[in-house]
């Protein structure tokens, strides 16, 4: 089934599966084709994390950048009250910490 033929709910399930696998290429393709869906990249999953939080936990800088490009809010707190920056710092993901801080510095919205 092509992505064009998938329903919005099917795309969201495929998105969640690609996120769990860290499949950046598949996620990029899905995000580009979600325009007709009411899909919120900032929605919280059953674990109380957004896709961005989960990508930071996994230490996947490429996926973090992709999600931010498609509107992931770096300021959102997870169920424990931690932002993506908090999670990155706690997890020792220095590359993600640097990216988030640099992005905030040159963005109109702060972390």
Curated annotation (Swiss-Prot):
Against PROSITE patterns, the record matches this protein to: ANK_REP_REGION (PS50297), ANK_REPEAT (PS50088)
Q: Does the keyword Repeat apply?
A: yes
Q: Which UniProt keywords apply?
A: ANK repeat, Developmental protein, Notch signaling pathway, Repeat, Transcription, Transcription regulation
InterPro entries for the chain: Ankyrin_rpt (IPR002110), Ankyrin_rpt-contain_sf (IPR036770), PP1_Regulatory_Subunit (IPR051226)
One Pfam family assigned to this protein is Ank_2
Keyword match Cell membrane: no
Q: Which GO terms describe its biological process?
A: blood vessel endothelial cell proliferation involved in sprouting angiogenesis; branching involved in blood vessel morphogenesis; Notch signaling pathway; protein targeting to chloroplast; regulation of cell-cell adhesion; sprouting angiogenesis
Function statement: Regulates independently canonical Wnt and Notch signaling by modulating LEF1 and Notch protein turnover. Stabilizes LEF1, a pivotal transcription factor in the Wnt signaling cascade, by blocking its ubiquitination. Involved in angiogenesis; involved in intersegmental vessel patterning during development.
Show the GO MF annotations: chloroplast targeting sequence binding
Residue windows of the ANK repeats: 47-76, 80-109
Q: Which SUPFAM superfamilies match?
A: Ankyrin repeat
Show the PANTHER family listed in the entry. Answer: MYOSIN BINDING SUBUNIT, ISOFORM O, PROTEIN PHOSPHATASE 1 REGULATORY SUBUNIT 12
Query: Superkingdom of this entry's organism?
Result: Eukaryota
What family does this chain come from, according to its entry?
Belongs to the NRARP family.
- The scientific name of the source species is Danio rerio
This chain belongs to the protein called Notch-regulated ankyrin repeat-containing protein B
């Amino acid at each position: 089934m092509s992505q064009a033929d998938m329903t919005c709910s099917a795309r969201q399930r495929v998105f969640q599966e690609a996120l769990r696998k860290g499949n950046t290429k598949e996620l990029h393709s899905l995000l580009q084709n979600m325009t007709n869906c009411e899909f919120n990249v900032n929605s919280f999953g059953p674990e109380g994390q957004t896709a961005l939080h989960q990508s930071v936990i996994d230490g996947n800088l490429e996926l973090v950048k992709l999600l931010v490009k498609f509107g992931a809010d770096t300021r959102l707190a997870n169920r424990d009250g931690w932002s993506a920056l908090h999670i990155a710092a706690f997890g020792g993901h220095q590359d993600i910490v640097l990216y988030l801080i640099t992005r905030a510095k040159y963005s109109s919205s702060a972390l």
